Amino acid sequence: MSRVAKAPVVVPAGVDVKINGQVITIKGKNGELTRTLNDAVEVKHADNALTFGPRDGYADGWAQAGTARALLNSMVIGVTEGFTKKLQLVGVGYRAAVKGNVVNLSLGFSHPVDHQLPAGITAECPTQAEIVLKGADKQVIGQVAADLRAYRRPEPYKGKGVRYADEVVRTKEAKKK
């Protein structure tokens, strides 16, 4: 039995929750997020809280309820506070710039890399070697950060590449003669 699903998600003031069958819509100051939940999950909205439980006839009901609780908690946090993800560019000549909703990267290729940001995600560059992504949808922010990192992953000898700000890159020792 999932212990995660037993804790309710507190809905703060200023957040509007609509439940239409298995489709949940959460609206706040940072935008509106919608998610379709698994059929095994039953969601109730009462007393400024969302409670979760399994439906009868589903073997994985508690597990799905725990997953649904975690996803909706992230949605509530996203529409109230938002999420940020920081990336660092390590390497000589590696630079980033933001123009509108396009991130321009110089990563040592013979051409510049232009990455189009999806709707709801904003980027800024405090320095040329740093990118800060902001948005309400945690999953989309993580995917955009992973896409940017995939252009030039940190290599294991010098650690050059695009890395998350909190990422520790393990470096190998060079080959000895």
Curated annotation (Swiss-Prot):
Single GO term (MF): structural constituent of ribosome
A Pfam family per the record: Ribosomal_L6
UniProtKB keywords: Ribonucleoprotein, Ribosomal protein, RNA-binding, rRNA-binding
Taxonomy, superkingdom: Bacteria
Keyword Thylakoid recorded: no
Cellular component aspect of the GO annotation: cytosolic large ribosomal subunit
InterPro entries hit by this protein: Ribosomal_uL6-like, Ribosomal_uL6-like_a/b-dom_sf, Ribosomal_uL6_a/b-dom, Ribosomal_uL6_bac-type, Ribosomal_uL6_CS
GO biological process: cytoplasmic translation
Family of this protein: Belongs to the universal ribosomal protein uL6 family.
Self-association state and partner proteins as the record states: Part of the 50S ribosomal subunit.
Known function: This protein binds to the 23S rRNA, and is important in its secondary structure. It is located near the subunit interface in the base of the L7/L12 stalk, and near the tRNA binding site of the peptidyltransferase center.
UniProt name for this protein: Large ribosomal subunit protein uL6
Gene name as annotated: rplF
